[in-house]
Structure formats: structure tokens, C-alpha cells
Amino acid sequence: AIELCRVGSEMCIRDRSSTLGPPFASACRYILGTTGRVVVTGMGKSGHIAGKIAATLASTGTPAFFVHPGEASHGDMGMITASDCVIALSHSGNTHEILTLLPLIKRLGIPLISMTGSDTSELAQAADVHLLASVETEACPLNLAPTSSTTAALVMGDALAIAMLEARGFTAEEFAFSHPGGALGKRL
């Protein structure tokens, strides 16, 4: 298990360096140009990663929050405004709950950044910019449980957050403001 995790994680990190090109720069420009908040969404394991990405963005100077796509279809779309930007995660890029939101996002006229494992997926094709977070195989010996694919998405999300932190000139003092408790708060 340890070896599978090591190999899977190394593969994800190695493969991300080749995807940090023009689409990544475009995604950064969309996020920097957002006057509202960055709304991050995803279903299943991608949803857990989306929540972590939203939290990391928010704690490093980019206002962001997570919206569950199932809840968005039942009223929570009201949380998303015309001044926001959406980052949608789906490894397949064809997750029904995410695809249901696409016409609503388009109606708002806000940027849609997709993060999927396939450039040809419906979500990737609908997005204003697509970030490819593909992997050859999952670390799971059955090649089923989202393992390497979620690591790839997490790495891409962290890269976005750090790029935004640097672009905004976010300081340790600002970081301390959003981390008043815990070990990080004490350290700052």
C-alpha cells in the first residue's frame, strides 16, 4: 500500500509540470479578474477535493467557497452571483450533477474553469478554460477507487492557490488574520 501511494503521488506530481501551461495561466487570469468569489464544486471524491481547494484558496487570499452540485440543483445556485467564477471538478468530466449546472452557469455569464481527467469530456468542452488532471492509472490495485486522480486534482488546486497567493502579494500577516487558532495561528 505504501509503495502504491508513493508511486501514484510521484506520477501525479511529475505529470502536473507538463500541464501548467497556457490553460493554467488563463485560469489564473479568470480567478484574478473575479470581483466576487470563486465557487468550487465537485461530486463524490472530487467534491471532497473541491472543498479542500476552496478552503485553501480562501485561506490564502482568494475568497472562495464550496457548493455541492446536488444542493445547487435544489436552491443553492442562489449562492452563485454574476460576479463569481466557477471551478468544477469531475474526473470523468461527465458527472450528471455537474453537467446539470452548466446551463445555469452559462446563463449567469460567469467564467467556468473545469478540472477533469479528459480533454474531450462534456465538462471540458463547455468550460472557458480546462485544466487537465489526468492520470494513467489509479493507485488502487483495482484501478477503481479515486486515488491518483484525486491527488492530481489536489496538486492542481494547490498550484492555483499558490499562484494566486503570489499574484496578490499575500503576506504572512494576512495569512495570520485567517488563521487565529491552532498551530499555524500560534506560529504567526
Where are these regions (language model features)?
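A short, well-structured juxtamembrane/interface segment
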Residues: T19-T34
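Internal, active-site/partner-interface "lid" segment
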Residues: Q125, A139, E166-L188
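Single conserved hydrophobic/aromatic residue that forms the stacking wall/gate
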Residues: A1-G8, I13
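Short, flexible, glycine/charge-rich loop motifs used to bind or transfer phosphoryl groups or to couple energy/partner
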Residues: A1-I2, A27-I31, H74-G78, T120
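Glycine-rich phosphate-binding loops that contact phosphosugars or nucleotide phosphates
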Residues: G36-M43, G47-M164
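Serine-centered coil/turn micro-motif
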Residues: P22, S121, G182-A183
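N-terminal beta-alpha supersecondary unit
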Residues: R14, L20-G21, G47-H48
